[in-house]
């Protein structure tokens, strides 16, 4: 079944953070989404605490690291757009998907829609640039948990798992600079 959004949550022994992340998704007022929890073999019982919900799919499969896990999750996605909201990440409020869907209706078919990210540890807002220029790409790209990617951008090329960190940054650069995909700023905070 096709849905508008696939919210992808990757984890390995996340403890209570898994339930917190999933609950923040389930609180969204906009309902045209699926949740894919990609677990790499947790032994802490966290996946057993997932609520019974037809919108949640649990994929339990070994992976070689965070980006391999994210690639496995996106391979299972049915949504037109995907967002990686990994364990510990939360939607900023219950209107994020509603506001995002409305923004997409006003400016349809773009490769990436991105917003701001609130960091609770530092009580600060990571403000994404209003317009994504090549200069901004190397200076201030948005956090992955605040980027809605067209799923098609992962069809031919996923995250490069040889990167232990920043493969999400590299993939954003590939999409915008190499593939010339338009990245549209959302005028609100997406994730916390």
How should these model regions be labeled?
Residues 1-192:
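Nucleotide-sugar donor-binding/catalytic module of glycosyltransferases
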């Amino acid at each position: 079944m096709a849905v508008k959004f696939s919210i992808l949550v990757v984890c390995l022994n996340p403890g209570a953070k898994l339930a917190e992340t999933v609950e923040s998704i389930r609180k969204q007022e906009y309902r045209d989404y699926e949740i894919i929890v990609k677990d790499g073999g947790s032994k802490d019982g966290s996946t057993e605490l997932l609520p019974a919900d037809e919108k949640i799919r649990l994929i339990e499969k070994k992976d070689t690291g965070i980006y391999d896990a994210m690639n496995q999750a996106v391979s299972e996605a049915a949504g037109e757009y995907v967002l990686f909201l990994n364990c510990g990440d939360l939607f900023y409020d219950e209107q994020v998907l509603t506001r995002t869907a409305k923004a997409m209706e006003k400016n349809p078919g773009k490769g990436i829609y991105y917003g701001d990210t609130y960091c609770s540890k530092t009580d600060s807002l990571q403000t994404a640039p209003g317009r994504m220029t090549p200069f901004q790409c190397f200076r201030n790209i948005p956090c992955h948990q605040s980027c809605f990617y067209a799923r098609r951008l992962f069809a031919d090329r996923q995250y490069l798992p040889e990167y232990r960190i920043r493969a999400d940054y590299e993939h954003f650069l590939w999409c915008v600079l190499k593939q010339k995909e338009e990245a549209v700023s959302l005028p609100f905070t997406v994730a916390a």
